[in-house]
Amino acid sequence: MKNKIKIRLKSFDHRILDQATKEIVSAIKRTFANINGPIPLPRKIERFTVNRSPHVHKKSREQFEIRKHKRLLVIDDPNPAVVDALSKVDLAAGVDVVIELESGE
């Protein structure tokens, strides 16, 4: 039976995301666990177009966008030391972390 831990990291700023990824990878490598990644996932770009004036000048518009960057880390056969190391990692405020546990049979 082979277990995996998948860690998905999301952020609006790619520099903060890369720094958080390096911190997690270094913490996991200290426990001598087998890690795959970081795997860069496709970024999602949301674009919004709004009128500059409320009533007239329909052709005058302004565009805004939000870029969401994502990374994936996969840990094969994690041991309790990996879980302990992950709980002690302190990340920046702009990074969203989702941890998934997969048990293979």
Curated annotation (Swiss-Prot):
SMART domains per the UniProt record, alphabetical: Ribosomal_S10
TM segment ranges: none
Record-level Gene Ontology MF annotations: structural constituent of ribosome; tRNA binding
Keywords: Ribonucleoprotein, Ribosomal protein
One biological process term in Gene Ontology: translation
Keyword Ribosomal protein found: yes
Any single Gene Ontology cellular-component annotation: ribonucleoprotein complex
Keyword GTP-binding among record annotations: no
HAMAP family to which the protein is assigned, alphabetical: Ribosomal_uS10 (MF_00508)
Family assignment from sequence similarity: Belongs to the universal ribosomal protein uS10 family.
Subunit structure: Part of the 30S ribosomal subunit.
NCBIfam families named in the record: PRK00596.1, rpsJ_bact
Described purpose of this protein according to its UniProt entry: Involved in the binding of tRNA to the ribosomes.
The protein, known as: Small ribosomal subunit protein uS10
Organism from which the protein derives: Rickettsia canadensis (strain McKiel)
